[in-house]
Amino acid sequence: LRDHPGQISFPGGRVEPQDVSPAATALREAEEEVGLDPARVEVVGYLPVYRTVTGFCVTPVVAIVKPPVDLRPDPGEVADVFEVPLSFLLDSANHQRCTTQFEGRQRDFYAVPYGDRYIWGATAGIILGLARLLSLR
């Protein structure tokens, strides 16, 4: 990530002229960044727009990926790819609300630690949004 190097994130990026929808953007970015074949992806919907503290508006796309999956990360964009069980992500016992000082202001953010990995910020916020939505069903 150019704007957030070293952070854990979902594939994603800016809308390009050929993108006809947020799903088209997500599928294109996932193919470019991690080599995910769009034919193996079934888009099931969108989460509400997520606004980051740095001013970005993200439209999270929810999809099911049909196995088997052969990912080929772009080394210029992605250092590592890993999988976290959905049951772990949806378990509120694994969700943390944290506070830090940033540019002289107190900032609250979410985190979902997983083993030696620290999922936080917008990525954790999007995960918690999905968990909240699914808990209502």
Segments and roles (model prediction):
Residues L1, R14-I119, L128-R137:
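Unchanged
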Residues L1-F10:
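N-terminal strand-loop-strand
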